[in-house]
Amino acid sequence: MTVLAPLRRLHTRAAFSSYGREIALQKRFLNLNSCSAVRRYGTGFSNNLRIKKLKNAFGVVRANSTKSTSTVTTASPIKYDSSFVGKTGGEIFHDMMLKHNVKHVFGYPGGAILPVFDAIYRSPHFEFILPRHEQAAGHAAQAYSRVTKKPGVVLVTSGPGATNVITPIADALADGTPLVVFSGQVATSAIGSDAFQEADMVGISRSCTKWNVMVKDVADLPRRIDEAFEIATSGRPGPVLVDLPKDVTASVLKEPIPILSSVPSMNRRMKEVLEEGSKNVTAKIDRVANLLKLAKKPVIFCGHGVLANPECPTLLRKFSERLQIPVTTSLLGLGAVDERSDLSLHMLGMHGSGYANMAMQEADLILALGVRFDDRVTGNVSLFAPQARLAAAEERGGIIHFDISPKNIGKVVQPTEAIEGDVYESLKLLDSATKNIKIPSRFDWLSQIQTWKERFPFTFTRSAPGELVKPQEVIQELDKQTSDIKDKVTITTGVGAHQMWAATFYRWTKPSSLVTSGGLGTMGFGLPAAIGASVAAPKDIVIDIDGDASFSMTGMELATVRQFDIPVKILILNNEEQGMVTQWQNLFYEKRYSHTHQKNPNFVKLADAMGIKALRVEKREDLAKKMKEFLSTKGPVLMEVLVAQKEHVYPFVPGGKALHQFILHESLS
């Protein structure tokens, strides 16, 4: 039987979604040049064995076994698991959550998913968090995952319950967050009949998940749940969706199910492929180490991928300090380096620091670790990193892209060298390869960077006594009063100008201490994310920095905070406008503020109605005192700060411009 056994007959799209991608993974395996191939793609081989062994619920899978010499060694006899016999699909779901060590589930009940909710009723094994909207369940699960480094689990009903989670699913895909979403579905006999609350979730979620499937037989449920957790966390993490028809979760399993092996045996050819890939990686690492000997102006650019392994930021910091290489980050990479270090360039990109943007444009060697090179960090791609491209042509530098996802490499920026695989493992190899090489002096380069730091600081015009406080002042005061406890602080944000002020005026020192929506930019993310982060780390001080417009999209989750007594701190910068959009309208649309201002409720009274303590700051001179009270309050608390309008976010790289063509605050112009 061939390893690359073609699928000859599949009866459903769900089956193709599952098995077609597994076969694709196997084909991908044979072209890998990464030593992490088995760890990353073992799943595909494992599932291919399953295809060969079983006649599954979707149809018979046949394979041509007469034309191949690349075979898997004979498998041992199949064993069977009878532990689920006599249990309903809902009860099997409960047991599978225990198997995967799930401690918390976020979601909302409904008719199509009631067999599962009945099975987990009063379960002592995990806690269920009930928000006021399914979107909030998804964002809370995202934050839970970002803090714990485990997949977040969402459980919702069919139809609108499931479609309400699509935004968090898309957000999780953009930011590489492992999310396992279980959606209820109408009974299999009613599928396609436009039944009440029926929605084609496999079709709807296909473009925003790594993998999705509808379970059509209760016997398939354990296997599908195992696959969901495996796929969500393997390679570049992301969301998966498992659709659960009501009759499947209500039916009882009557026969034992096969116990499937998790790791296949490999023949000699497979082992040769892996050994060849390992040699290729070693050769690439050696070439990069040689470029580090030649480079005079290197920069490290790190993204969210660096935070995937808790040990990677520590290694990165030691590596950059030993080789004296300055480090900049993406928005989602904030916290990977201690921004109090002289080697920190802070955030890169459209609203990043002027000195990070200048350094990226002038660098002759860029080590890009776990990044996507999205448009917010590159500016005009054709004008991005000109000196590194020149150095690459002269074989003395270039752009080196380290990433676990092959599709991210070369998608936006063509690298000089691509190191595909786990970023932490690759960085360990590079660290080892550079231990005994002679590194040139970085004195001139670091001096130039210091000059840029003095010339292009983050700045703003402070408010006068009696005036509304400036939003940047609020972030600086928060930074000041948490400076000694940052190892205990986790911050979430909504999306908008407040998000950028938090990124640039707060000094990030702890890995994964910022939980925000990066790639999709989802307004309303902040409060539900704070709920999820606090559930994940109840001893941490979790602060949601939010704007009034963003907060208003999910503000009803204050009721969730109160119901579960979640000790989040909510800081609202209220300027009664959509600040990021009004900035564009001011600069490029002749101040035509089309529908970007709104009247807000009294947030203090709103919080009070929910049973949550609330404070308000209206003048600059009250800020420090109220901030201290805000931070020292036990339990949930909300502080509304009335801030000045038309405060823009600077620096700012306009669309179509290069990174070094940024607009500065008027005080620096």
UniProtKB/Swiss-Prot annotation:
Pathway: Amino-acid biosynthesis; L-isoleucine biosynthesis; L-isoleucine from 2-oxobutanoate: step 1/4; Amino-acid biosynthesis; L-valine biosynthesis; L-valine from pyruvate: step 1/4. The gene is ilv1. Thiamine diphosphate binds at residue 134. GO terms for molecular function: acetolactate synthase activity; flavin adenine dinucleotide binding; magnesium ion binding; thiamine pyrophosphate binding. Mg(2+) binds at residues 548, 575. Its cofactor is Mg(2+); thiamine diphosphate. The keyword Transmembrane does not apply. FAD binds at residues 236, 351-372, 403-422. Keywords: Amino-acid biosynthesis, Branched-chain amino acid biosynthesis, FAD, Flavoprotein, Magnesium, Metal-binding, Mitochondrion, Thiamine pyrophosphate, Transferase, Transit peptide. Its EC number is 2.2.1.6. Binds 1 Mg(2+) ion per subunit. Binds 1 thiamine pyrophosphate per subunit. This is Acetolactate synthase, mitochondrial. Belongs to the TPP enzyme family. Residues 1-140 form a transit peptide. It holds the Pfam family TPP_enzyme_M. It catalyses: 2 pyruvate + H(+) = (2S)-2-acetolactate + CO2. Its main location: mitochondrion. InterPro entries: Acetolactate_synth_lsu (IPR012846), AHAS_TPP (IPR039368), DHS-like_NAD/FAD-binding_dom (IPR029035), THDP-binding (IPR029061), Thiamin_PyroP_enz_cen_dom (IPR012000), Thiamin_PyroP_enz_TPP-bd_dom (IPR012001), TPP-bd_CS (IPR000399), TPP_enz (IPR045229). GO terms for biological process: isoleucine biosynthetic process; L-isoleucine biosynthetic process; L-valine biosynthetic process. It is found in: Mitochondrion. It comes from Schizosaccharomyces pombe (strain 972 / ATCC 24843) (Fission yeast). GO terms for cellular component: acetolactate synthase complex; mitochondrial matrix; mitochondrion. The keyword Magnesium applies. Residues 497-577 are annotated as: Thiamine pyrophosphate binding. Gene3D superfamilies: 3.40.50.970, TPP-binding domain (3.40.50.1220).
